[in-house]
From Swiss-Prot:
Species annotation: Staphylococcus epidermidis (strain ATCC 12228 / FDA PCI 1200)
Disulphide-bonded residues: none
Reaction catalysis annotation: Hydrolyzes single-stranded DNA or mismatched double-stranded DNA and polynucleotides, releasing free uracil
Role noted for this protein: Excises uracil residues from the DNA which can arise as a result of misincorporation of dUMP residues by DNA polymerase or due to deamination of cytosine.
Keywords, ordered alphabetically: Cytoplasm, DNA damage, DNA repair, Hydrolase
Name assigned to this protein: Uracil-DNA glycosylase
EC number per UniProt: 3.2.2.27
Keyword set includes DNA damage: yes
One GO MF term attached to the UniProt entry: uracil DNA N-glycosylase activity
Pfam families per record: UDG (PF03167)
Main location: cytoplasm
Subcellular location: Cytoplasm
Active site: 59 (proton acceptor)
GO biological process: base-excision repair, AP site formation via deaminated base removal
């Protein structure tokens, strides 16, 4: 199974023409993130057959020079978002590695699908592209990973991500849940949750190569 087959299956069962038309107008008349060529970058960098981990985000960062198609990641010279800074703090506390770049392309190439549930946003307007069709698309993506892959770790931070648990077969995958790493909730159970070591211990127990979370 490849992404092209997954996408074909989804688009034969759902009509995304209205969303496509809306986005064409938005990209023509508004500033929208990420750049159009980066909307599907998570799928470009993480082949379906290589997925080991899915980290779910919500919608892209809505400031300039941030979003580039990977959940939680920002472009290499962008300012660190607070949630990502907290993710890195937990990474250092969990497995002792220190990351300096806010760009998570290396994680994506390691088999970590960094998936937002909504893939576009208008500049300065969080959640502005909710309910245009993206949720249907990404719910189907989660379902496809659950159905056609084995022993994937799904990392669900915060309540919106955890609502997607219903699409995941827990008999053959691991779900890691905690509060979101945002400053509003990180101290309510995200810190100390050890998602990175838990993920790698599970992957090793299933005979898979662990994720290299540290910068190489």
């Amino acid at each position: 199974m490849k992404w092209s087959e997954v996408f074909h299956d989804i688009t034969t069962r759902h009509d995304f023409q209205a969303m496509h038309d809306f986005l064409e107008k938005e990209y023509t008349t508004q500033t929208v993130y990420p750049d159009k060529q980066n909307i599907y970058q998570a799928f470009d960098l993480t082949p379906f057959e290589d997925i080991k981990v899915v980290i779910l985000g919500q919608d892209p960062y809505h400031g300039p020079n941030q979003a580039h198609g990977l959940a939680f990641s920002v472009q290499p010279h962008a300012k660190f978002p607070p949630s990502l800074r907290n993710m890195y703090q937990e990474l250092e506390n969990d497995i002792g590695c220190h990351r300096t770049s806010p760009h998570l392309q290396d994680w994506a190439r390691e088999g970590v699908l960094l998936l937002n549930t909504v893939l576009t946003v208008r500049q300065g307007e969080a959640h502005s592209h909710r309910n245009i069709g993206w949720e249907t698309f990404t719910d189907e993506i989660i379902q496809a990973v659950s159905n056609y892959r084995e022993h994937v770790v799904f990392i669900l931070w915060g309540r919106p991500a955890q609502q997607k648990e219903r699409f995941i077969d827990t008999s053959k995958h691991l779900i890691i849940k905690s509060p979101h790493p945002s400053p509003l909730s990180a101290f309510r159970g995200f810190f100390g949750s050890k998602p990175y070591s838990t993920t790698n211990n599970y992957l090793k127990s299933k005979g898979k190569t662990p994720v290299q979370w540290c910068e190489s």
